[in-house]
Amino acid sequence: MKLLSKLILTLALATYASASESFRYINWDNPPHDVTFYEGDVLQFTTNEGRNSTITLISDTENGDKSFDGVLNEDQRSFVQKALPPGRYTFKDLNSGSKSIIRVKESKELAKEVRPIDRLKDNADAANTENAQKSPNTQSTQKGSPKSDAKEASPKTDAKEASPKSDAKEASPKTDTKQGSSPKTDTKSSTQKPSSSSDSSKAKAEANTAANNEEAEHVEKGASNTLKASLSIISAACVLSLGYLL
């Protein structure tokens, strides 16, 4: 029995050692160059969320079809697209047997980098063509602009040649005012009008002050009358109280 148990233990250790030797761990955060995959290789990488993940290689065929253990999630799919060398990769679940095939090509990543640059170049070329089309229109407008024609025959020079100011100077109405009645008397009469208005305002102010004084006198008289009445009532009450006591 002891011999059988020892044999079983040795066989188990041998199988475990052989199995452990068949699994080779490859860190794909810093992937090696020109790597060849073998059966049992385990690819280790860090996901976008910072978790550690692994993909196990099941078989490596001659035509480049590489089969891995497990169904791919989004992180593993992006990992395969970026990290693995070009080839056709088959990922299958050992329990369910479902498969997912991914083909990795170098041109796919290059196209993503080239397309935005090409779009920017196309936009720049389109903008240059638009500017080139607009530029001859502006030159034509500058060559035959109506402003230059207006300057050549402007109505301002005609107005200066025959300005009405010189005619007004020749026959100015000032000499007529000197010969006739002077306008100074009119200005005096015009200045007398505001003085009359000021007199009326003064009269109104005096009337208001007089009315206010009369109201104040009435108030003072009313107050004195109330005081007198209250004093007479108090004196009468005192007399009555004294008479009652006596």
Swiss-Prot record:
Write out the biased-composition intervals (Basic and acidic residues): 113-124, 146-177
Q: Where is the composition biased (Polar residues)?
A: 126-145
Start-end of Low complexity biased regions: 181-213
Repeat recorded as keyword:
yes
**Signal sequence range:** 1-19
Q: Where are the sequence repeats?
A: 145-153, 154-162, 163-171, 172-176
- Please give the residue ranges the record annotates as the region Disordered: 113-223
Identify the stretch(es) annotated as 3.5 X 9 AA tandem repeats of S-P-K-[ST]-D-A-K-E-A: 145-176
Record keywords, A-Z: Glycoprotein, Repeat, Signal
Point out the glycosylated residues in this chain: 52
Question: Does the keyword Transferase feature in the UniProt annotation?
Answer: no
Please give the name of this protein: Protein 3F
- Which species expresses this protein natively? Dictyostelium discoideum (Social amoeba)
What lineage, starting at the top, does this entry show? Eukaryota, Amoebozoa, Evosea, Eumycetozoa, Dictyostelia
Gene behind this chain?
pspG
